[in-house]
Curated annotation (Swiss-Prot), chains A, B:
UniProt cross-references to HAMAP family, sorted A to Z: His_tRNA_synth
Highest taxon of source: Bacteria
Cited SUPFAM superfamilies: Class II aaRS ABD-related, Class II aaRS and biotin synthetases
Molecular function terms from GO: ATP binding; histidine-tRNA ligase activity
Catalysed reaction equations from the record: tRNA(His) + L-histidine + ATP = L-histidyl-tRNA(His) + AMP + diphosphate + H(+)
PANTHER family: HISTIDINE--TRNA LIGASE, HISTIDYL-TRNA SYNTHETASE
Gene Ontology annotations of biological process type: histidyl-tRNA aminoacylation
Name of this protein: Histidine--tRNA ligase
Organism classification: Bacteria, Pseudomonadati, Pseudomonadota, Alphaproteobacteria, Rhodobacterales
Keywords: Aminoacyl-tRNA synthetase, ATP-binding, Cytoplasm, Ligase, Nucleotide-binding, Protein biosynthesis
Keyword Coiled coil attached: no
Location, primary (coarse class): cytoplasm
One cellular-component annotation, GO: cytoplasm
EC top class, as a word: ligase
Amino acid sequence: MAKPKKTPRPKAQTPKGFRDYFGAEVSQRAEMLQRIAGVYHRYGFDALESSGVETVEALGKFLPDVDRPNEGVFAWQEDADADKPGDWLALRYDLTAPLARVYAQHQNDLPKPYRRYAMGPVWRNEKPGPGRFRQFYQCDADTVGASSVAADAEICAMLCDCLEAVGIERGDYVVRINNRKVLNGVLEVIGALGDEPRLSQHFQEMAENLGKKMTAAKVGIVLRTIDKLDRLGKEGVRSLLGPGRKDESGDLTFGADLSKAQIDVVMSFLEAKGGTNSETLINLREIVGRSRIGKEGVDELEKISELLSAGSYGPDRIVIDPSVVRGLGYYTGPVYEAELTFEIQDDKGRTRNFGSVAGGGRYDDLVKRFTGQEVPATGVSIGVDRLLAALHAKGRLDTTDVGPVVVTVMDRDRMADYQAMVAELRQAGIRAEVYLGNPKNFGNQLKYADTRNSPVAVIEGGDEHEKGVVQIKDLILGAEIAKSATLEEWKDRPSQFEVPRAELVAKVREILAQHGLEK
Amino acid sequence: MAKPKKTPRPKAQTPKGFRDYFGAEVSQRAEMLQRIAGVYHRYGFDALESSGVETVEALGKFLPDVDRPNEGVFAWQEDADADKPGDWLALRYDLTAPLARVYAQHQNDLPKPYRRYAMGPVWRNEKPGPGRFRQFYQCDADTVGASSVAADAEICAMLCDCLEAVGIERGDYVVRINNRKVLNGVLEVIGALGDEPRLSQHFQEMAENLGKKMTAAKVGIVLRTIDKLDRLGKEGVRSLLGPGRKDESGDLTFGADLSKAQIDVVMSFLEAKGGTNSETLINLREIVGRSRIGKEGVDELEKISELLSAGSYGPDRIVIDPSVVRGLGYYTGPVYEAELTFEIQDDKGRTRNFGSVAGGGRYDDLVKRFTGQEVPATGVSIGVDRLLAALHAKGRLDTTDVGPVVVTVMDRDRMADYQAMVAELRQAGIRAEVYLGNPKNFGNQLKYADTRNSPVAVIEGGDEHEKGVVQIKDLILGAEIAKSATLEEWKDRPSQFEVPRAELVAKVREILAQHGLEK
């Protein structure tokens, strides 16, 4: 008989683009989500948790982001039933597509308007990169079925409260708002400027290839171009709005082929931000006031800032800013973005603004795919991992978890005594554990306490047991003394205390309090 | 040109076996997980969050549960790279398999022993049934690398603390412990009883088909049989340990073919529970004392109960119970199970014990698949959804979320005033919202407040605005009055109050406090 082949051992590795989170990384995120949920709830939003798996049919197979139509999902086919092939299922790629499905499925049971929040992992089947993972958290709040801009204003206020709830101080952030309708006004105005649009041969072909009307294709280029303001700068944007642009490699990107007058209008929109919100509104009215939709957009921005001011969310926090272009292609009305204004050092030691941590806006096609009915919606997504990184960069998050008090095992036969000690400490609310490894080598036990970042070790050998005392070692102080052994003032401070067994909890609590570690 | 076919609208439905969770269902589970995490943390366990996706290779393709080898996972193949086929990925089916992968992958960076907790969704590709979903939560704590039964004892204590932390009172639960080693002792003892095991023809064939030694096959039947004690009762188990058993349909199940003396030993083990833990230990020693492994198992049980007593986890909460058989086939040492002892009414109105809500035990092959090295581990899994159901059955959970205070919109042009009111309420920590639907029909606004389960509605029309007052409607009291309109005492109690605008927050807070709804 042939010897059966030995199966090779499996590799102990996460799939590419996935990672594990340990200790404080997990609990800090959990706490942040809980605080944000608290704010969302206070604003009247109800929790919704849908599952990670949806039918591909309900989800739509690809992300809506026009620039990356190939960004995919993780999908698989269910086993076939007796008479029909299995459904295709997929992991959700965001929390908005499931919201659309939920709203269409349960709409008779949901309040109208429906304010809901959702937080949880989403999955993207894309090439992983540095700091770019294929599973990450989203933390969204959306109002479905409210066409009033009061809904948008409310979400901007909520965004401010969320940032403050997680530890971003007032003055360290700003919520910038813009409106797709103003941009539509800009497009109307430039349309009126060029009765007979100048179209290059290339542009005509492209529009035909896309099966779009020429104006639609042109609008697409304008939208994509202004979305690149950050990356290309003003001159780059001007070139792309005009005949086109050569990049560093010499490759030519064809432009929207607008006239100079048209380009001037677009640029004046992007640069319309004044010293105050009122000034910005005046500038915008000047640019798009002739367009009905444009004027409506400016009116909405004015209304939003007025509603927010009434709730004391003033211009120190809410800024109308036409240069907020991200998402203008996707959204249909107001858009908003929270930006942290403080500077941080990036990985390469360069100082830069931290930038955007949340964004959202109004979109009106939420459930249309399912029901044919247009339902207005507006919502925000907070980038929890970005926010954690920001707090970390500001030194407001201690990423090392405080370890447990470690009760060492001097005498294996008296494990019950040591268990009694940890039980007392835990019942007093103190994080504590008995050493559960092989107790033979005492040095290993202290090394373990060090690995665990323990503040205190408890020692009770035979002598102590007989005398009815325990030794309590202040490991934080001990480490400080070890670091600065030359300093006389440290040398004289004892870091180990002998106390009666009955005073164990009190003494440990005292030491924790000295280090600011009490609960 | 042929008219393009209209794409049919997608169905707005969860995939079969998945469901959505709304409002209080979500927040109550989140709160429960947070409380359990608090206890786990206090016991020195560190959080671990791995992703939902693992390689099939790392995960192992199927569940370890011997009785259901076809219980599957959701799996798919990654897109191929240029030169090699894509990896197979899958959704995790529990939190233990990922722990094994994490421990093998990161072992040099982890403390030893490693106490970790994990909570999150897992997925099973099985036929859904009533109340049986293909995504559900697990909430685990495991200690890896500690061979001492002190680790098992600690987890039993922690289980008690978790139950009390989520609202199960002392006296309403018991943690029952048993030990696989005692069962191994039983098997040794019965092996010694039958020098020449009596084997039916069928039994011999089966053992050969399974490619196992006859004794191994026999042990398998004994294990599976005692695991069916709950379902078959003592007589059923006796039959299956002996020649076999005819079920109601007349089908014969072949048995383990043990002699009467052997069966008596197994049954005496299952019925060894005495009035106290000490009595049980004496009974067990009598049955398996002659077997080395059996004696070791009884010693361990004694040690565990001694360690727990030292931490004041006494016999009112910790019960040695040989009839705990679930998992004895899978685990290698101590096993434990938390059972709620109170009675509830089931769906059909029958009274029954609520039963098990958590279980676990010791298993030693955690990372062996990856490293070849045997690492001892012990851990528990708390059934969060079962626990929520238990609290609900006891009336300790209110599943209706308290709705927000609703500020109604009497005058669409004064939205800023209404926004100012909700801002004040929210800043005072009160859940509140302004009505964001079409305000034309005031009745709809009150209906909305009703749908939202709102405790209070705020009304400010033109008259009130001029007078500088607001109307505050106590909706809870209003509903009570409406229900019992014949009672004179109710009739005279007003449920609507006019207060100065400046007293809005104070009055709302007062009403909430009257209904026990203050924060």
